[in-house]
């Protein structure tokens, strides 16, 4: 889910978790999803201040540079992107051209950092577990939680990627649940839990505390870790994890072209 967050008292806005469409079979990218965001930005006359990533996504490519070139904004992510870059720089055997210092991004956020979207005040929570670099952006009374909490009837994000940790995710979720009960929670994905036929993306901290099927009603950490570990062992890798990681750890840029002018994505065999 991509969000556009607008200051009601000005045209200032931010884009959170953009998508570049990608067809694995043909190796072709498509900007349809990003162009819908651009059309909305232009129709509303928005002044984009930020293009934010909650983490290095493993299931879709980021359109951050495409959006930045067309509507502006600084690209931001958590400072622990360097951990992800080091981990997957080795997985994909990246050469020295691939910088592992996060310099591909305009801003590296740390826990407690603040930022502004016009008159809106934002602050950063470091919420690792799904990945080491996951952030939650708390903007006034809204929390954009990425892949930590999902809708209460679906639960929580997986933790079995390299650098993931069920213990860390549980602790991160407690940090989110410590926000005021009325805080609006905007999730990064929705999968329509069994018995629900429509997509949903907004809930509240109070609803999550009371109703989340994985962590609600004060479930202890050891029960959560056991459940999450057993559940993750049954999950297949996301279909786009290999292309997504190579692009997203570069802030949405493609790997450099080879001497024939073509850009390639690697497939490490028997690795993930």
Map each language-model feature to its residues.
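Accessory terminal helices/loops
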Residues: 80, 171-184, 188-272
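Active-site HxH/HxHxD metal-binding segment of metal-dependent hydrolases
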Residues: 13, 21-28, 32-120, 210-211
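Active-site neighborhood of phospho(di)ester-bond hydrolases with catalytic His/Asp-centered motifs
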Residues: 16, 47-56, 75-79, 126-129, ...
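Core dinuclear metal-dependent hydrolase active-site scaffold
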Residues: 4, 111-139, 178
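Divalent metal-coordination and catalytic microenvironments
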Residues: 5, 17, 55, 67, ...
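Active-site-adjacent loop/tail segments of enzyme domains
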Residues: 156-179
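Short active-site segment of divalent metal-dependent hydrolases/proteases
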Residues: 58, 133, 150, 192
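A short, flexible beta-alpha/helix-coil linker loop
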Residues: 19-23, 150-151, 155-158
């Amino acid at each position: 889910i991509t969000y556009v967050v607008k200051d009601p008292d000005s045209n200032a806005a931010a884009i959170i978790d953009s998508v570049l469409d990608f067809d694995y079979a043909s190796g072709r990218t498509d900007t349809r999803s990003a162009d819908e965001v651009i059309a909305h930005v232009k129709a509303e006359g928005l002044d984009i201040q930020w293009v934010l990533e909650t983490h290095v996504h493993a299931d879709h490519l980021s359109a951050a540079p495409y959006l930045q070139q067309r509507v502006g904004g600084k690209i931001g992510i958590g400072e622990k992107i360097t951990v992800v870059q080091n981990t997957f720089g080795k997985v994909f055997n990246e050469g020295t051209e691939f910088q592992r210092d996060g310099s591909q991004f305009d801003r590296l956020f740390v826990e407690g950092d603040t930022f502004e979207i016009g008159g809106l005040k934002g602050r950063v929570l470091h919420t690792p577990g799904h990945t080491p670099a996951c952030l939650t952006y708390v903007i006034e009374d809204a929390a954009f939680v990425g892949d930590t909490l999902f809708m209460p009837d679906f639960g929580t994000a997986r933790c079995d990627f390299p650098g993931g940790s069920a213990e860390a995710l549980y602790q991160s979720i407690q940090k989110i649940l410590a926000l005021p009960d009325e805080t609006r929670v905007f999730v990064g994905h929705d999968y329509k839990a069994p018995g629900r036929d429509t997509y949903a993306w907004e809930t509240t901290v109070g609803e999550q505390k009371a109703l989340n099927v994985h962590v609600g009603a004060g479930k202890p950490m050891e029960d959560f870790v056991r459940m999450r570990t057993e559940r993750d062992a049954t999950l297949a890798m996301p279909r786009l994890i290999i292309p997504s990681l190579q692009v997203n750890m570069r802030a949405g840029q493609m790997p450099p072209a080879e001497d024939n002018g073509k850009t390639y994505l690697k497939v490490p065999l028997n690795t993930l």
